[in-house]
Swiss-Prot record:
HAMAP family: MhpC. Pathway: Aromatic compound metabolism; 3-phenylpropanoate degradation. Catalyzes the cleavage of the C5-C6 bond of 2-hydroxy-6-oxononadienedioate and 2-hydroxy-6-oxononatrienedioate, a dienol ring fission product of the bacterial meta-cleavage pathway for degradation of phenylpropionic acid. It is an enzyme of class 3 (hydrolase). Homodimer. This is 2-hydroxy-6-oxononadienedioate/2-hydroxy-6-oxononatrienedioate hydrolase. It comes from the Bacteria. GO terms for biological process: 3-phenylpropionate catabolic process. The gene is mhpC. The lineage of its organism: Bacteria, Pseudomonadati, Pseudomonadota, Gammaproteobacteria, Enterobacterales. The record marks 114 as: Transition state stabilizer. The active site is at residue 267. It comes from Escherichia coli O81 (strain ED1a).
Length: 288
């Protein structure tokens, strides 16, 4: 039987999660079947979703025999919104813990991009026994950069887009989000803008969260040595959102880690270099 590509609609699922005395309706996509599960965690950009973030990576993982879970973190996609005054990454980790508990999944491989990488580290620090392998892309620890003034130009444009969600500001952000902008089609811009504007509560609550706590993503640097999971760190050489030296901090702090840097690549390695990225990840997951 020939392989049938996964679709967002057919794999869409919801679960209720208790958080700080409230019930949140959390959306995720559940793709494929397999003894091992890979959870994909998206970044913090306006309009981001698990499916949109990893659209070029889902089928290769499923075809390789993995069950793939794509979570919409609270405040993104079809999940409920929230004003968060603590660590956003620890919040996402708690939500993920509840989801995998309800799905009766004992252990997961984690693959996170940007905020998703930071949230993957938070999950691993809190529940190390639940993590198989770790893939961190363009994120994983906060803290300052030795070479790049903070906040970076990418983060400045991201925050501006949250406050003024226009097509002009979206294009300004995406113009430095990836290295080669020729793949940024009008259809992609329109889909991302529609995602943003369909959930203005997400945009407003992200801004309120920043006002309540500007440091949504704490510095995990001092705790990286606690991570024992085999870890693949992936970075774009031309990332203008999270500087490449953050990847070097992860490499230095996590004993069982290795670093792969893509040249001619911005903040979206899994999309910009999808074929090479997919093979890199599959080889890493398959190793003993």
């Amino acid at each position: 039987m020939s392989y049938q590509p996964q679709t967002e609609a057919a794999t869409s699922r919801f679960l209720n999660v208790e958080e700080a005395g409230k019930t949140l309706r959390i959306h995720f996509n559940d793709c494929g079947q397999g003894d091992e599960t890979v959870v994909l965690l998206h970044g913090s950009g306006p309009g981001a979703t698990g499916w949109a973030n990893f659209s070029r990576n889902i089928d290769p993982l499923v075809k390789a025999g993995y069950r793939v879970i794509l979570l919409d973190c609270p405040g993104w996609g079809k999940s409920d919104s929230i004003v968060n005054s603590g660590s956003r990454s620890d919040l996402n980790a708690r939500i993920l813990k509840s989801v995998v508990d309800q799905l009766d999944i004992a252990k997961i491989h984690l693959l996170g991009n940007s905020m998703g990488g930071h949230s993957s580290v938070a999950f691993t620090l809190n529940w190390p026994e639940r993590v198989g392998k770790l893939v961190l892309m363009g994120g994983g620890t906060g803290g300052m950069s030795l070479f790049t003034p903070m906040p970076t130009e990418g983060i400045k444009r991201l925050n501006q887009l949250y406050r003024q969600p226009t097509i002009e500001n979206l294009k300004l952000m995406m113009d430095i989000f990836v290295f080669d902008t020729s793949d940024l089609t009008d259809a992609l811009f329109e889909a991302r803008l529609n995602n943003m504007l369909s959930r203005r509560d997400h945009l407003e609550n992200f801004v309120k969260s920043l006002e309540a706590n500007p440091k949504q993503f704490p510095d995990f640097g001092p705790r990286l040595a606690e991570i024992k999971a085999q870890t693949l760190i992936v970075w774009g050489r031309n990332d203008r959102f999270v500087p490449m030296d953050a990847g070097l901090r992860l490499l230095s702090g996590i004993a069982g880690s290795e670093l792969h840097i893509f040249r001619d690549c911005g903040h979206w390695a899994q999309w910009e270099h999808a074929d090479a990225f997919n093979q890199l990840v599959l080889n890493f997951l398959a190793r003993a």
